[in-house]
Curated annotation (Swiss-Prot):
E.C. numbers: 2.4.-.-
Main location as per UniProt: membrane
Function: Glycosyltransferase required for the synthesis of succinoglycan (EPS I). Needed for the addition of the seventh sugar (glucose), catalyzes the formation of a beta-1,3 linkage between the seventh and eighth sugar.
Protein name as catalogued: Succinoglycan biosynthesis protein ExoW
Group of enzyme by EC: transferase
Keywords associated with the record: Cell membrane, Exopolysaccharide synthesis, Glycosyltransferase, Membrane, Plasmid, Transferase
Biological source species: Rhizobium meliloti (strain 1021)
Encoding gene (name): exoW
Record GO cellular component, one term: plasma membrane
Pfam families xrefs: Glycos_transf_2
Similarity remark: Belongs to the glycosyltransferase 2 family.
Places the protein is found: Cell membrane
């Protein structure tokens, strides 16, 4: 049996969240794993979360403490510390939980079909209505079925499909092989958004084969989630949209020879610009100054921001 390393970035403010995630790890039907928890200066102390674990469980966990680096930085620390005898890395966000067969399904699918990268489906409550399962891809995309129970598929045009809508992919359902965990890393500077999507794309580009499993691998939780904690009126919203634009701009350089992917990327970039500008218009309406420093940085990177501002102004005046 191959050994897996579980990488969990930890930054939470409430008790019991990490403990719940770890309980789902130790309930796995495949038991050949070690756990790396990266304490990213979590406000709620990790020692309290580990206190109730059995001794044999505690011995299978390595805690690495670091200055706060955001989710991508924490996962990079995990990837940099994967034991030499590990063949796979499975990611789990500390506010999510795995279903019992997640690691077993991943291991069997990746070894049987010689895949470097694997995703399972994810489930969750009404707050995560936008997620959809792997089986739903068959309604609109060309899918090759590899096995029926559980349903495992591959998409010949995965790169184009995921850039059109990546809501069937989630970090807590992702498992990667040695070829990827030895060389692919997160863009740690993107702390507020899109570091996961950029990592997904880099892994797909570096893989000889990617397989997708319809069986749910994880259930989404509702702990502290940096992306979802920022609403349109948050002071951090503009930076979040800029992070998104930077990630998309990076992807544009990766996919210049794929017209469908480029079309999707440019559409998302346009949306990021418009949402950013609307947020600044709302600040003005509330008699607050726009965030000129970050707008200037964005404009320096992306002169098309002026065109988007003009479009919004014309649209406002024509009403």
């Amino acid at each position: 049996m191959a050994k897996l390393t579980v990488v969990i970035p930890y930054y939470q403010k409430e008790p019991g969240i990490l403990r719940r995630a770890l309980a789902s790890v130790f309930a796995q039907t495949l038991e050949d794993f070690h756990v790396l928890v990266i304490d990213d200066e979590s406000p709620y102390p990790i020692a309290d979360e580990l206190a109730g674990l059995a001794q044999e469980e505690r011995e299978r966990i390595t805690v690495i403490r670091q200055p706060n680096g955001g989710p991508g930085g924490a996962r990079n620390t995990g990837l940099d510390n994967v034991p030499a005898d590990s063949d796979f890395v499975a990611f789990l966000d500390s506010d999510d939980v795995w279903t019992p067969d997640h690691l077993l399904n991943a291991y069997q699918s990746m070894t049987r079909f010689d895949a470097d990268c694997y995703w399972a489906s994810i489930t969750g409550g009404d707050a995560f209505y936008y997620h959809f399962g792997v089986a739903d891809l068959e309604k609109s995309e060309t899918v090759t079925r590899l096995s029926e129970s559980p349903l495992v598929v591959e998409l010949p045009e995965l790169q184009d499909v995921m850039l059109k809508n990546w809501s069937f992919l989630h970090m807590s359902c992702m498992v990667i092989g040695r070829k990827l965990f030895e060389k692919v890393r997160f863009e740690a500077t993107l702390k507020l958004a899109a570091e996961d999507v950029l990592f997904f794309c880099d892994c797909v580009l570096a893989s000889k084969r990617v397989v997708l499993c319809d069986a749910a691998g994880a259930v989404r939780g509702e702990g502290l989630n940096i992306f979802h904690s920022i609403d349109n009126d948050s002071p951090q919203f503009l930076k979040q949209q800029f992070n998104t634009w930077v990630a998309l701009d990076t992807l544009e350089g990766r996919y210049r020879n794929r017209p469908k992917a480029m079309e999707a990327i440019r559409s998302y970039k346009h949306t990021a610009r418009r949402q950013a500008l609307w947020s600044q218009a709302r600040r003005i309406k509330r008699r607050k100054l726009p965030q000129f420093d970050l707008l200037a940085r964005w404009l320096w990177r992306d002169p098309r921001l002026i065109g988007s501002a003009a479009e919004l102004a014309v649209g406002k005046l024509s009403r």
